[in-house]
């Protein structure tokens, strides 16, 4: 989108794909992605403290829509998740590890749903596509964690070949 001053406006979506460390690291390497931030989507509070509030671990992805699209971001997401798994990616189990795409822009949600509906396996896919109702930035220790602590890659659900390739590109 172009804003009123004729400058390119970046688009923002929130992508959940299990543990956010690997998801953030992977999306940092995707062409067209300008910035990522680890966070929590659609919980009921604005706090990082206290009991679990229904959030999904997610990565805020800011991208240039002339360089990539929601469909392309979804295709990349499907490279690193098991789309048939509900509330589980790799060894990480629980509702906070569910997969999803969240946005405040209905166009993003429509394109994500169209991507899923265009797949032959659409009836088996457990990824949720919902409006973003709340976002909380994760603590600094979780921001770009694998870049600072590559020894933690062994905890990640993303296949080694994919994760190692993204390590090379950083």
Name these PLM-found stretches:
Residues 2-168:
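Flexible coil/turn and secondary-structure edge motifs
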